[in-house]
Amino acid sequence: IISIMANNQKMRTESDLLGSVELPADVLYGVQTLRGIENFRISKFHLNEYPLFIKGLAITKLGAAEANHKLGLLTDEKFNAIAQACREIMDGKHHDAFPVDMIQGGAGTTTNMNANEVIANRALEIMGHQYGEYQYCSPNDDVNCAQSTNDAYPTAIHLGMYATHLKLVEHLKQLIESFEKKAAEFADVLKMGRTQLEDAVPMTLGQTFHGFASILRDEIVHLNEAAEDFLTINMGATAIGTGICAEPGYAEPVSYTHLRAHETE
């Protein structure tokens, strides 16, 4: 339902079990996100300040949609619209529609619903419908199909952390390159090596920088090993680990086929 306020701002009405609320007609999020904004004003850090986490959410929703589409749970029209919405978010669009506080009750339910509503409303727009017309594409029944906050949210965190890890390694490699350049530049500059806060034996300044580079190379190896744990996810476990509400044959494709295909995008 679209209404016009006294200041000529268009509003739309959405409802949940607690009642109806009005929100600006042009915002991509919905009633659950609005309730989250009102209920959780805790840290002053908001979801839209963490783009790699939002990207992880979009990748998670895209992987789930691909698996559900192949199982016949999403029509071609719904799937194509949801997939386009997810890819737009992965490309950095619509991040302003994720305003909820990072600290919230419910183990991330508000964040999960924020993503579901944004993707659903953008999908509705792609299909030619109005925001909030969830009978055509539902945040819960379609975007969140076969998922729970308890598997989608930690999966998104893992993917966001893995993307952060890749950026960290990229920057460390640049720093190693800089150290190696300095090692070559100062290869003939003598200095005293020090141990126990005292002068010890001669060495070159270049050797010092070469040592810095070697340490960082070792750290990259350790980081890469640790980051493998981020690729261990629980998608398909749903709410309590039993896979309830997910179709047989959903968990393996969503985890091993679809999410793996998008992990480095």
Model-derived regions: residue spans:
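A helix-coil-helix interface module used to build multimeric assemblies
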Residues: 6-242, 246-256
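Short, Lys/Arg-enriched N-terminal segments with co-localized hydrophobic residues
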Residues: 1-4
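Single conserved hydrophobic/aromatic residue that forms the stacking wall/gate
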Residues: 258-265
